[in-house]
Amino acid sequence: MGNFLGIDTSNYTTSLAVYNTQDNSVVQRKLLLPVKEGEVGLRQSDAVFHHTRQLPDLFESLFSENIKLDAVAASERPTQAEGSYMPCFLSGLGVARILSAVLGVPLMRF
């Protein structure tokens, strides 16, 4: 089959992984989102900002070697429940949609 890229921009981690179906291997890169000292969590606007800053670095690291993609997948919401929504997921989903369109490969949402 080939190489499948997964993108996840949930509330606390920016994550990329490529699964190779030929040798059943996974290469991944991820960065935690910074939470200010003494704070319990992140506002969605801060999470979106940090994902936007971290995604290019992760892509540069993961794709330092030429990897041909056969499909792209991205998380789009925290749960499958109707109406489930968090803005931080739009960061990864937007990048996945762009890659799918530019590369002409299928987009899967989860």
Where are these regions (language model features)?
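Short acidic/glycine-rich loops and adjacent helix/strand connectors
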Residues: M1-F110
